Curated annotation (Swiss-Prot):
Interval spanned by the transit peptide: 1-66
Keywords, sorted A to Z: Chloroplast, Fatty acid biosynthesis, Fatty acid metabolism, Lipid biosynthesis, Lipid metabolism, NADP, Oxidoreductase, Plastid, Transit peptide
Name the record gives this protein: 3-oxoacyl-[acyl-carrier-protein] reductase 2, chloroplastic
Localization per record: Plastid, Chloroplast; Plastid
Catalytic-site annotation from UniProt: 235 (proton acceptor)
Organism from which the protein derives: Brassica napus
Reaction it catalyzes: a (3R)-hydroxyacyl-[ACP] + NADP(+) = a 3-oxoacyl-[ACP] + NADPH + H(+)
Pfam families cross-referenced by the UniProt entry: adh_short (PF00106)
Entry EC number(s): 1.1.1.100
Pathway entry: Lipid metabolism; fatty acid biosynthesis
MF annotations from Gene Ontology: 3-oxoacyl-[acyl-carrier-protein] reductase (NADPH) activity; NAD binding
Assembly with partners or alone: Homotetramer.
Family: Belongs to the short-chain dehydrogenases/reductases (SDR) family.
Length: 328
């Protein structure tokens, strides 16, 4: 298998066996051809009875006709094309929750575009893990708060795989400080990436999904968007905005069979929580009824259900908390 590398937001072109794909972002593309096992042919039919039976010419003709029909039926079944793997775009997928989501969907058989802003090496490792599962992945560097980057990202997925079935908007940052000390630049940074980025990605994906009258969008917000948190006025505002925005997007997309839902994590184990002192951790865990941190895989499991399960086809416009009970 050959791997073709392309570079970040200054692109060149991507060569594949099918030809050339041109775009302006840098990415790394890997594709594993799925293994197709043809259905086995049935051999001669055997009668389970040992009793002798008479055979007439009409019976022989009838049996031959049935055998021919069975062979044709088997051939038709073999000719049925394999269901295509869903194409998924996951933003902020180089680490933490985004990484867990990308790996979960890749393991489930999806073709995954792994978006990152600065962590190219980590994103590349995520793609390699997806490939190890037998999947396909594109690693794409881009800032989701910039419209040109978002358009190039969506084009990359469509050029590589023909469509986009699922988008998971996970990219986000924090710039924590008390409200009275918060600089406008700290406010703007968080709103631009955490809210405007979701708007741009959802808008771009919806245009593609509306044409095929099908799609699923999962936006990662936070329990902070529901209950607030000291020192996170900017973050809480952005995540509350994501929830309201997603409900409107769900109403507008419903007529085209586009489901839009929100996942609101609470305290999830991360590099940051690992560095907290014992006293701080004790205080945090005291606010969680289940008394422990969630794991990135907990969030990924819920996202996978909303993204892929037929049982989630009638769910839209909902905000799901996965927080150990903080928002009860």
């Amino acid at each position: 298998m050959a791997t073709t590398s392309i570079a970040g937001p200054r692109l060149t072109s991507l060569k594949t066996a099918a030809g050339k794909l041109g775009y302006r972002e840098i990415c790394h593309v890997r594709q594993w051809a799925p293994v197709h096992s043809p259905m086995p042919h049935f051999g001669m039919l055997r009668c389970g009875s040992r009793r002798p039976f008479a055979t007439s010419s009409s019976t022989v003709v009838q049996a031959q006709a049935q055998a021919t029909a069975a062979e044709q039926s088997t051939g038709e079944e073999e000719a049925v094309p394999k269901v295509e793997s869903p194409v998924v775009v996951v933003t902020g997928a180089s680490r933490g929750i985004g990484k867990a989501i990308a790996l979960s969907l890749g393991k489930a058989g999806c073709k995954v575009l792994v978006n990152y802003a600065r962590s190219a090496k980590e994103a590349e490792q995520v793609s390699k893990q997806i490939e190890a599962y037998g999947g396909q992945a594109i690693t794409f560097g881009g800032d989701v708060s910039k419209e040109a980057d978002v358009d190039a990202m969506m084009k990359t997925a469509v050029d590589a795989w023909g469509t986009i079935d699922v988008v998971v908007n996970n990219a986000g940052i924090t710039r924590d400080t008390l409200l009275i000390r918060m600089k406008k630049s700290q406010w703007d940074e968080v709103i631009d990436l955490n809210l405007t980025g979701v708007f741009l990605c959802t808008q771009a994906a919806t245009k593609i999904m509306m044409k095929k009258r099908k799609g699923r969008i999962i936006n990662i917000a936070s329990v902070v968007g529901l209950i607030g948190n000291i020192g996170q006025a900017n973050y809480a505002a952005a995540k509350a905005g994501v929830i309201g925005f997603s409900k409107t997007a769900a109403r507008e997309g419903a007529s085209r069979n586009i489901n839009v839902n929100v996942v609101c994590p609470g305290f999830i184990a991360s590099d940051m929580t690992a560095k907290l002192g014992e006293d701080m951790e004790k205080k945090i865990l005291g606010t969680i009824p289940l008394g422990r941190y969630g794991q990135p895989e907990d969030v990924a499991g819920l996202v996978e259900f909303l993204a892929l399960s037929p049982a989630a086809s009638y769910i839209t416009g909902q905000a799901f908390t996965i927080d150990g009970g903080i928002a009860i």
